[in-house]
């Protein structure tokens, strides 16, 4: 426990001078205006918000700072947080999120306040819980870090970017700065992209991107109307004898609907499990598959043992329907320099393909078991190295 308890006020004394003790508990009972200044919190301090206490109008730099508060606004929407922060649970209401987004019945944006700054602030914490609402984001590419849990509380996140290549949430890639990111859980929210509103045609605006990381669980999510994929997994970061593959990813009870390119794409990964997911209504730009397992067509001949592959992917109890392309497309590439297939060990069990199909080629060891494949005029089952 902190040896010192300091009450912070908007007194004549500068705010920074009131934050001058490491490992102290600072009690904030009233509105603190930082007057557009940068204020650094001493190392290991605790900010305890009580009554109507909140901080506004400036930049607050944490230093292993813990926040304690009831479910009230404690950081106004004109606060920028930097540095390192923690809380037992960080609630979205702390950060002045505005749940005023209005969309029509198809998900098209009508109006709403931008919550991009609030999202950047809350993502500095590890354990996030959103109050159920409909939130609008004008910007995107929100970076997630290791050891993070995001519980959306059944909220809707509506994002609207004018860029041709972006994603709503990104794991493992901060605009080219690669970093292995591990132990992440995302659950209980819906992402709605701007496929219906935008006249900018692209295939690279994804709901969630897992570029590089391990031990990642997505559960009870919906990702739809993105101008790329609902979920993208993969990268082309190559080094000899170093594995940069996203790995050990579980996708459970998720729905990928009405996306522009694919419901989900895997271009590089090892150990991915889809359980109880739906891939539906993909339409826009080829391949337009429900799920596409397809390495990018790049030259890996200069690298030894670069681990560029799609391997050990399991699809169980999933549903594929009404995709303009294949239900499941597995498109292998040529063998690597060691003569090995780079798409290996694909297992499909107890799944339904309604007005869809499975197309697979250029791979080794694919097993399809106990599936219903209800094809239409487009449907077929074509394969290479497939055991059914």
Predicted regions and their residues:
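Conserved small/polar residues in nucleotide/adenosyl-binding loops
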Residues: 384-388
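Short glycine/acidic-rich loop motifs that flank beta-strands on beta-rich extracellular proteins
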Residues: 36, 56-59, 138-140, 154, ...
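N-terminal extracellular ligand-recognition/capping segment immediately after the signal peptide
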Residues: 9-13, 23-59, 116-167, 191
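Right-handed parallel beta-helix/beta-spiral solenoid domain characteristic of secreted/periplasmic
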Residues: 48-63, 70-78, 82-117, 149-206
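Feature marks extracellular polysaccharide-active and adherence modules
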Residues: 29, 50, 131, 151-153, ...
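Solenoidal tandem-repeat scaffolds enriched in leucines and small polar residues
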Residues: 246-247, 265-267, 271-274, 278-295, ...
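Short "repeat-start/strand-capping" segments in structured domains, especially the N-termini
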Residues: 41-43, 144-146, 182, 213-216, ...
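Intrinsically disordered, low-complexity Ser/Thr- and acidic-rich flexible linkers and loops
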Residues: 107, 237-243, 297-308, 336-339
């Amino acid at each position: 426990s902190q040896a010192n308890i300091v009450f912070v006020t908007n007194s004549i004394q500068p705010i920074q001078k009131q934050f001058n003790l490491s490992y102290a508990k600072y009690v904030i009972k009233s509105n603190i205006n930082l007057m557009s200044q940068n204020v650094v919190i001493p190392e290991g301090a605790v900010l305890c918000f009580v009554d109507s206490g909140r901080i506004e109008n400036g930049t607050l730099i944490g230093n292993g700072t813990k926040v304690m508060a009831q479910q009230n606004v404690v950081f106004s929407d004109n606060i920028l947080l930097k540095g390192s922060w923690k809380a037992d649970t960080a609630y979205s209401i702390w950060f002045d999120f505005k749940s005023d987004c209005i969309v029509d019945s198809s998900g098209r944006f009508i109006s709403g306040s931008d919550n991009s700054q609030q999202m950047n602030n809350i993502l500095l914490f590890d354990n996030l819980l959103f109050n159920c609402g409909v939130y609008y984001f004008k910007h995107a590419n929100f970076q997630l870090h290791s050891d993070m849990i995001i519980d959306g509380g059944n909220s809707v996140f509506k994002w609207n970017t004018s860029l041709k290549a972006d994603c709503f949430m990104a794991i493992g890639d901060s605009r080219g700065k690669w970093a292995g990111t591990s132990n992440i859980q995302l659950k209980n929210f819906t992402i709605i992209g701007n496929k219906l509103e935008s006249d900018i045609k692209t295939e690279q605006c994804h709901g969630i991107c897992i570029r590089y990381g391990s031990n990642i669980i997505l559960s009870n999510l919906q990702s739809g109307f993105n101008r790329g994929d609902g979920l993208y997994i993969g990268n082309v970061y190559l080094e000899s004898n170093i594995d940069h593959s996203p790995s050990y990813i579980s996708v459970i009870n998720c729905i990928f609907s009405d996306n522009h390119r694919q419901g989900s794409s895997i271009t590089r990964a090892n150990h991915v499990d889809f359980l109880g997911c739906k891939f539906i209504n993909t339409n826009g730009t080829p391949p337009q598959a429900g799920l596409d397992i397809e390495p990018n067509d790049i030259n890996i001949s200069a690298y030894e043992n670069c681990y560029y592959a799609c391997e050990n992917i399991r699809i169980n109890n999933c549903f594929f329907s009404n995709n303009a392309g294949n239900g499941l497309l597995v498109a292998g590439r040529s063998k690597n320099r060691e003569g090995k297939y780079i798409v290996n060990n694909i297992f499909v069990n107890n799944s339904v393909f309604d007005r869809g199909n499975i197309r697979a080629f250029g791979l080794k060891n694919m097993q399809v078991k106990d599936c219903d494949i209800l094809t239409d005029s487009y449907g077929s089952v074509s394969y290479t190295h497939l055991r059914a």
